[in-house]
Amino acid sequence: MLRGSLRSMSEHNYRPRGGGRSQGFSSIPSTQQAHSAGSQGGAHANHGGHGESGGHFDLAQSALDDMHAAGFKPEFGPGVEEQTAAIEKALAQLTPGPGVEDLWGLGWSSIDNDTSRDLDQIEVAERVAGGVKLWVAIGDVAAAVEKGSPIDQHAQAQTQTIYTAVKNFPMLPLELSTGVTSLNESGDRQAVMMTFTVGPDGEMLEEGVSLALVRNRAQLAYSRVGPWLENTAGGVVDDDVTSLRSDSAREHAADESMTSVGALGKDWLVEQLKMQDEAAQALHAARVKRGALEFHKSEADPVVVDGRVISVSEAIQNRAMNLIEDLMVAANGVMARALRKGGRSGLQRVVKVPVRWDRIVALAAEHGITLPAVPNSVMLNDFLEVQRRVDSVHYPDLAVAVIKLMGPGEYMLMRPDDDPTGHFGLAARDYTHSTAPNRRFPDLVTQRVLHAMAHGEPAPYSDADLTAIAAHCNDADKALRKIERTMQKRVAAVAMASHLGEVFAGVVTGSSDKGVYVRVIQPPFEGRVIQGEQGLDVGDRVTVKLLHTDPARAFIDFAKVGMRAVGPSAGNASPAAGH
């Protein structure tokens, strides 16, 4: 799927959309009826009709070739199959062990993409004196995958699961990540659990981290819960929560009776979602007050069937996605503080102060706003919110530019006595990655550190080990992001091959000795300006003509047509007629 420039702020557990995420190395089968990843959440504007030309290009093979060329070995090595079978057998029957709470009976639920099978987290809420208490349970991968084992070696080498529109490269065997370590509906699982109470002002109280036995009672979908929370979808929630359950949950339910609310009561899901949403909004408001940046994201979402690009849609983040984002950001903070309090070193996830703050200041000045010379996230977010309200048409241009100028996140050693580097974009002082161990190696590392702390055991990793892991994950992330960007361009090159000569509105997202790059607004895709690029800088608004596409080389070439004015008076920023 095309994620493009918006990924850099996705430091929470919100996962990328992508059809066939559970298909491993397979492309999306035709039996999914041209299922778009975009149907998994958010509102969509379809820019179809891009698709049949270029369909002969083997996108799936090109993704695999790119992985190999970058030095990755996505195929699992010797010993993995045997280890996987042993883990499946061991986890077939679970009983609470020492220090593991039995919370099977709580009303746990999940919200994720429609086709997701590698579910990392489930949630449950309870109204208590002073606010809403949240339990966030994360699949306990560390309890299943031994450090140094064949599966662990593969996970550490690849560092994460890679999702593209046509081929996924899982970090863990699918029998684990979509099976016995996934929190799919109706399965008993061991989990790492973060608890915290959220007050009306969004402040977090009574934090804790522990181990628990859990069961997901309702596997829900962003695409259904979002409109329901936003009051844009009619109807009520059924007793078996069919109206909000994901496609995947319904397709894989061995016994539909297991999904009924039963003794939990008819209205439990409605109350759960309302409480979770209330807490999430309070958490979000508090983070914004501290300086968290709000980017109202939209993403390109290609429809790919049997490796052929059929069309490109625009997917917009909805309220259900925001709910999960805010709860996971909070849970990651709880974990980071628990490790610090326990005197344990771990990995922190940081976004440093923007190196190109001066360019952000210049962009604000173009809109008549003065930002201070010293980076200030509160004032930056105020500026972004004002622009979103007064100039929603051009807001995507600005958001893309600022995200690019923010720079990427990275991992660093987090010693208990060190002053945290912090996460500039999330306004988080203590922050780690702990909520996606099925698909991110640093999260698995964090779980192992927690297990050792919980059982009074020596640290599984030395500070030197953690420093090396952080460096490797940062290097791998850069290489894997390059592969993703290349695949995004290949998919877009196929999709846009029939639109040569057309003019589009866009914003400059990259400017260096390597070239000038522009992201088109609708449909979202990125290419290089090869004519008239002189003098362009990140954030400049331009109109460009599509000159050439070459999926094999991942080339999309533009010619600059002109500059676009800043602000509401700039006129129509939409692409040429027909788009």
Residue ranges and their predicted role:
Residues 2-4, 10-13, 21, 28, ...:
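Electropositive polyanion-binding surfaces
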Residues 558-568:
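Short, compositionally biased
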